[in-house]
């Protein structure tokens, strides 16, 4: 079941499936590869930004469709193609701002931790680290005569 978001657009349950549908159906061919490149290069942290851009493009296409109903028609083949370059430039500047803010936070958790002195790094051939635990031995249950009880 759909609901209205803060932009006033109807959204379905799965935002990723919605994003795929919008990228395939409603956005120009010039913008779609640019958005997918950003997603593939930057991963999940860019998904919200890409979704926001897709919402804006869908909203402008919706408004354009309403203008066609009430005003002069525009060719459907050109719909959405004029906005591809400014949106990509906006995405690029947003990516630069995101990268700058990430670098100001310090090292990422995904980076390799600093090497401890005296510890060797694992090579590709290592199959894992074997850890041997020495457990304390349980006292034997012997009676006074040396016989095992139990």
Curated annotation (Swiss-Prot):
Superkingdom in the source lineage: Eukaryota
Domain Rab-GAP TBC: from-to ranges: 1-43
Stretches for region Disordered: 102-125
Compositional bias annotation for Polar residues: 102-111
Coiled-coil stretches: none
InterPro entries listed in its UniProt record: Rab-GAP-TBC_dom (IPR000195), Rab-GAP_TBC_sf (IPR035969)
Name of the protein in its database record: Putative TBC1 domain family member 29
